[in-house]
Amino acid sequence: MTAPTHNPTHSDGAQMFANRLHKNLRHLGRWLKRGHIHCYRLYDADIPEYAVAVDVYQSEQRWVHIQEYEAPRHVDAGKAQARLREAVAVTRQILEIPEQQLFLKVRRQQKGKAQYRKLGARGQFHSVQEGGNRFLVNFSDYLDTGLFLDHRITRAMVGQLAAGRDFLNLFAYTGSATVYAARGGATSTTSVDMSKTYLDWAGRNMELNGFGGREHRLVQANCLEWLERHAGQHHFGLI
């Protein structure tokens, strides 16, 4: 990663953005090393004019996932686009990322299934590490990558509490919490989600970490309806 310097080609705003990235890298450095954290949010609209989230995924290579928060209508669209281009260029420069390892999306306010709608069909997955587990992420085909970075602490708690318990994961998405439960010694895991796509992804995550078999069930169903149908039939020690 490049050292902080003043770049005369940067606008004042771009230089502020660059300075903030450098500051955040310094601030996070020890925490990342101490926690063996490879995937993290580096920047989250710290400067209002540069309303983007910058997530870093480190494995054999480094990938950067930038999401622009959709600008309000009163913001000049041309200026917003110019600032976005600056943010992308500065991020690439500081993190030394080639163009093909940076992915850019616009995050609009969405509800229901729209937030999980497929954006592309490249089908390119990459393996990243978190908490001693491996997870497949996809930077191009969906708005989210398959691993919610802000759930890291919750996943770790699941792993710590799972030993000897039957674990139920509702709205399981790509099954990252299930992987933690299995790694933590859960007697069994049941992952329920309506999406076959995400359940298949969850299954691949489980296989990637060496888990499978009858004790690890993947159930495609509406979670609330599934709960009603199975009420009283099975008691889970961790949900």
Label every PLM stretch briefly.
Residues 1-69:
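Non-catalytic accessory regions of SAM-dependent methyltransferases
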